[in-house]
Amino acid sequence: MFAKLENLELKFEDLEQQLSSAEVFNDQDRYRKLTKAHADLKQVVDAFRRYKEMKQNLADNKELLGDSDHEIRAMAHEEIKAIEAALPDIEQELKILLLPRDPMDDKNILLEIRAGTGGEEASLFAADLFRMYTRYAEIMGWKVEVLSASDSDTGGYKEIIALIAGDKVYSRLKYESGTHRVQRVPATEAQGRIHTSAATVAVMPEAEEVDVDIRPDDLRIDVYRASGAGGQHVNKTESAVRITHLPTGIVVACQDEKSQHKNKAKAMKVLISRVLQAEQERAHSVIADARRALVGSGDRSERIRTYNYPQSRITDHRINLTLYSLDKVMEGELAPLVDALVTHAQTEALKAQADAS
């Protein structure tokens, strides 16, 4: 492990030298690539330097144990105790930082939320989830762009698809995919009975065209008249677009914009990411049906998380974490959940690494 860390530090120092060069600065494409490589290494190199400094301090204080002055020996003894207590934590941090990175972690995401079982209440919950993720994005300084939305009669969403763009979005939200279950008294419930409904969430890394090989011959593009709200524009022009990727059968439709060109661009953005997701899951031999693998069926019994409003309780069933701060979570304070899921994933990866060695 330490030989690898030494090599990373040398690489980091080499990058710093290159970045200080006027020649590199004048080549903006190269400068951006080197800046990103430098930023990717900074955290692990900073931690390694702290570790080396602590080890040096430990050695220095051990030498002081032979000093003739009693007070100096006592101070050295206390320092040694403090350093030895802190070393395991930084060693664990270094092990985590050396874990192989998910190449998708830096990407933006496509967030898809669909109402599952529970009728109109499920569509209202889908809207609540979208608001929760939007608030979290605001806290993180990310941007949210709605690509497609299908409204329900009560002001919820049957389905909504959005692009969330910013720093390392996928690394933070990739664990949100699955069925989310809600337990609460609907506004329309006269008897005050608690109902259970569900919504599915799918988080996919935003794919660029270079990530996926999609040939024009693989696409069938249909245009049709938009339906739903829209005033005089509705049914006047064929602005809605439906794109089918023939090899996979993936279909994406968009009618939110008045321009057929804009609808096509939005639909292609979603399609490319769905095809990439399907290719990745097929490559990992998860299952043939990529969409079902990602989110489940939307049935209440298949859930990754439960939101219990009467008890203000939120439980993530994958890691057995329960928090009694549902109101804060729904206002976008997702960090305690996300941090716990990231830590769990890192711990599992370390266990797998140890088992393999």
UniProtKB/Swiss-Prot annotation:
Its main location: cytoplasm. Peptide chain release factor 1 directs the termination of translation in response to the peptide chain termination codons UAG and UAA. InterPro entries: PCRF, Pep_chain_release_fac_I, Pep_chain_release_fac_I_sf, Prokaryotic/Mito_RF, RF-1. It is found in: Cytoplasm. It comes from the Bacteria. The modification N5-methylglutamine is found at Q232. The keyword Protein biosynthesis applies. It comes from Nitratidesulfovibrio vulgaris (strain ATCC 29579 / DSM 644 / CCUG 34227 / NCIMB 8303 / VKM B-1760 / Hildenborough). The gene is prfA. Belongs to the prokaryotic/mitochondrial release factor family. The keyword Cell inner membrane does not apply. Methylated by PrmC. Methylation increases the termination efficiency of RF1. Disulfide bonds: none annotated. Transmembrane segments: none annotated. One of its GO terms (cellular component) is cytoplasm. PANTHER family: LD18447P. This is Peptide chain release factor 1. NCBIfam families: prfA, PRK00591.1. It holds the Pfam family RF-1. GO terms for molecular function: translation release factor activity, codon specific. Keywords: Cytoplasm, Methylation, Protein biosynthesis.
